[in-house]
Amino acid sequence: MISKALISLLTIALSLASTAQQQVTIPIETKDNVLVLQTDADNRLSTIYFGGKLKDSLEYAQIARGYRTDDNNTGISNNAYTPAGTWNLMEPALQVIHGDGNTSTELKYTAHETTRIDANVQLTTVTLKDPVYPFEVKLFYKTYAAENILEQWTEIRHQEKKRVVLKKYASANLYLTGRKFFLTHFAGGWAREMQPEETELSSGIKTLDTKLGARADLFQPPSFYVSMDRPASETEGKVLMGTLAWTGNYKFDFEKDPYGHLRLITGINPFASDYSLDAATTFKTPSFITTLSENGKGEASRNLHSWARKYRLRDGNGRRLTLLNNWEATYFDFDETKLVGLFKGAKDLGVDLFLLDDGWFANKYPRNHDSAGLGDWQENRAKLPHGIGYLVKEATAAGIGFGIWVEPEMVNPKSELYEKHRDWVLRQPERPEHYYRNQLVLDLVNPEVQDFVFGILDTLLTKNPKLAYIKWDCNAVIYDAHSIYLSRKKLPQTHIYVEYVRGLYKVLERVRQKYPAIPMMLCSGGGGRVDYEALKYFTEYWPSDNTDPLERVFIQWNNSYFFPSIASCNHVTNSGNQPLKYKIDVAMMGKPGFDIVVGHLPAEDLAFARQSLKTYDSISNLVWHGDLFRLIDPHENNIASLLYASQDKSRAVMFNYLTNFRTLLAPIIDPVRLNGLDPARNYAIREINRYPGNTGGGLSEKVTYSGDYLMRVGVNPVVTAKRSSVILLIEEVK
């Protein structure tokens, strides 16, 4: 006779077996794509598919059956968030030391929920728990359906008796099936940002990372794309674009598993960043943003641009201001009279505002060069006896706005701030200081320093409510990473790289809460700090200190893979020996500005520049809010050609630039095929922004073309050494 106890045990066993066999399939869909997660018999969560959406969602559950792998490896390679320390032999997404010293973590699926935020946005939250420890990971998947964007992040939390040490804590752990993968990333340095490199990924791990702290993107931005099966073109091929929304150290691991598939682990760089997490405290990772296209790089870029303008970039659907910067006109050598004299040039040029750059502050150690004054944000009385308010007033009287440059995260050793608050500086004890551009980085981990940095902006904007623009610079990396504040609080120094960035965000959040509307440029010694978390607070970014227009064609082209043109600050300067028209036309790829001595321009050049800004105003909505189509790649051809089309397909503007000045004759023989038009409509084409006296390219404004013709056959913009830049306006004829 079977005892009641045995019956009870059998019932429990059968119940557990039944639960284990209840496979959970979680499809996370956008308009065209889907990421499918699925549990196995042990409730481990895997990624079983990332690709085009199926018509019948019930079929997602069958996908995993089509793959055959070694039973000993099943679920390791494609784990949705791979923990370290147990049966995993691959690169982990999560590595933990538990409160009792145990270095292993197991994560099992326990629940998920999907919340519809609005008609386009949906959030899926998946909860994973360790079966032994009170340790929990939540995976967040936010989808933007129309834009085909997937945003991922992770939250880690525990209820253990002692602190848990997080040694690695990725934002995302993706899995791509295939046989060949081609990674394109962007290397470089100061004045040579965004240089593309394409590599076919082989067995093992390819890592992209930075350890620079501030100005973290100096050598490499946190953005890439992976082509599957073959290198993608603008219009063909399967490609995944990804970018991490984090203004600090990052690490991307691309690992081909034993089956030839690709594991992708992205997030904060764990280098020198073990994080001690208290019980009942949540650690949130930054967002990893991806888009998947089966129609080439162009579609993927347009997905990101559309999403950024609508959901991430500050005032992404608004307007932008053109400006004149004083830097190349004066450098540090200016005074009140000289600056006011430049206002007339700004007005004559027709820009919206005048931007005062570096050198306006500090008294005991005047900011007359780059080795003194940073940190002392009072107007220099010798240069500006009547203060910033006087300049704002005079600019307003001249009919232009007034903006100002700051670098609030930094300090020169030769400053009053350094003398009073050496404890506010990141520096190693008992060791000599190391300087980058003669400066050190303030300890934004410290709330007092956060208050100080916020106060710089708050004081300027409170005293001068008509200030029209802020340029926020960041010229140094973090050397000697040590926080006196962390030591005083008895917190690990390994928190410094994470908490510095969080401190920066706290300051920016306060600035935007109080001053939501002021335009702000994100700058970091050029393009050393461009990401989608920082751009929540900034309306635009500075791509590079290299303003040679030929180099800028390439830098701006490569930034366009990830960031919309409305955010790109492109200035006309004295750099480069190309004609003024070429420089202005290149600047029109985004938001143009000027860094010149207007009074030194010949009368005909000034008249052309003024007219160019009026021309730009007539096409600015196309550039800012249109769909970008890259037509001819300058890395592979003698010209660059790109087009912005209105979303209703009624207008487009096409920019063409000569990029090989060794070519004396027409470098382009064949017509350029356009994109973004309606094949059933008719269009007229005319050349705009022509320099007076220059001959046209032979296109008749009286001829109409079907969109079908323009996209299948094309037109020749006739770019030559004498016509080194050509802008064509395409308008529907009704």
Regions found by a protein language model. Name each.
Residues 1-23:
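Bacterial Sec-dependent N-terminal signal peptides
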Residues 22-37, 44-255, 271, 682-695:
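Polysaccharide-binding surfaces and accessory modules of carbohydrate-active proteins
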Residues 32, 226, 633-679:
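Carbohydrate-binding surface patches
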Residues 75, 85-107, 236-249, 291-313, ...:
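Glycine-rich, aromatic-flanked loop segments that form ligand/cofactor-binding clefts
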Residues 102-107, 275-294, 723-731:
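Short Pro-Gly-centered flexible turn/kink motifs
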Residues 315-455, 464, 469, 486:
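Aromatic-lined carbohydrate-binding/catalytic grooves of carbohydrate-active enzymes
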Residues 412, 418-451, 498-600:
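Glycan-recognition surfaces
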Residues 660-734:
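C-terminal beta-sandwich/jelly-roll accessory domains of carbohydrate-active enzymes
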